[in-house]
Amino acid sequence: MQETQPPTSPPAAYAPTDRTVPTRSADRASYDGELVHAILDEGYVCHLGFVRDGAPVVLPTLYARVGERLYVHGSTGSRPLRMAGRTDPGLPVCLTVTHVDGLVLARSAFHHSINYRSVVVHGTAHQVTDPEEKRLALDALVDHVVPGRSADSRPANTKELAATAVLRLDLDEVSAKLRVGGVNDEPEDLSLPHWAGVVPVRREYGTPLADADLAPGTGLPGYLTAL
């Protein structure tokens, strides 16, 4: 049976908890729902942390957001997926997504920094077992990478579905953290002869390179030119 879906619209703000209130630079934290969604929707790779055999493990993997829920891609042979499906309580995890927006070069080595946006999600991940929800989750994962791609590709067959696993993680315990702005040098360092400022960092897409075996007459999809 498919799990009840969480709300599709973000809350005005997520409620802070002991785990989502930062111990340093608390002024950079935000619980704004729209900001959290925007940071998640812009990313491609999340880092999923959990405990395996008493030791911490962090794995990079693809993810997608559907409403107030994240779907995380994996293989049925991977340890976290097996652990999440082992018992009903699921797998306690911590998931992060980070964007680097600028390199902040100060006059002093100590005050170098980066401008960034990040989201941290705490919760319990569960393996998706409902076939309909699994197909929807896999479509969402494909469309998260390139919007519109799932409708322009062959759907997964039975064998591929059996080899693919998906984790579900609801956005209940969530926080964002970000740094914006320029250099924070000490007043006595301002006259030093060292360049200081911010180097912006941006994501840029190159020209698509067609596969050598592309069927004749296959044109470049509009959703790629729109990237």
Enumerate the language-model features and the residues they cover:
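C-terminal edge-of-domain segments
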Residues: M1-T20, T129-L227
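General beta-strand recognition
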Residues: R69-Y71, C94, R168
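Short, structured patches in soluble enzyme cores that scaffold and shape functional sites
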Residues: F50-R52, G74, V97-H99, A125-Q127, ...
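Short, structured beta-strand-loop surface elements
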Residues: P6, P10-P11, T76-A140
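Catalytic micro-motifs at enzyme active sites that drive phosphoryl/nucleotidyl and oxygen chemistry
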Residues: F50-R52, A106-H111, R154-A156
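Short, surface-exposed beta-edge/turn micro-motifs
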Residues: V45-C46, G90-V93, T164-V166
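A structural signal for short, well-ordered beta-strand segments
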Residues: Y63, G123-A125, L167, L171
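An N-terminal domain-cap segment
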Residues: Y14-Y71, L81-R82
